[in-house]
Amino acid sequence: MSEEIESILEANALYHVYDSKAEDGNVVALRGLHVKVKPGEAVAIVGPSGSGKSTLLKCLGGLMKPSAGNVSLDGKNMTRLTGQELILLRQKTVSFIFQEGNLLPHLSALDNVAQPLRHQKVSPKEAKRRAQELLDELGIGHRAKGLPSTLSGGE
């Protein structure tokens, strides 16, 4: 029987609520999410604008404390660490590519979305097919050939 590989990053019952004075009340950005990432695994966070992608990544990377739930990185509960302990753990384990620089400028939107699949050894044809399907699902399939410099921030 094979031994199960442990997660390098794990989030359990993750919630994040932004306070708001708007008529609708507070904004729930994350609602009970569970995430597990194993060493060497490539993961893409995909969703429409305003769906909580950036909030999730900030919570997973220790840049923001979740309203509830916990995040473990390299076996340590990050949600309980503060100050220097948290800084040292982040320096050893996690890096960020912020939204402004996360697309490869010489590749089309389609090829950028297909990249994580190619790293998982998915054939180029299948990776492009799946990437186009995802872009269509998000309502931006018509922008598949666009270079990052021609896309808006929400695309």
Each predicted region: which residue ranges?
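A short, compositionally biased domain-edge/stem linker segment
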Residues: M1-S2
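ABC family nucleotide-binding domain
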Residues: I5-E155
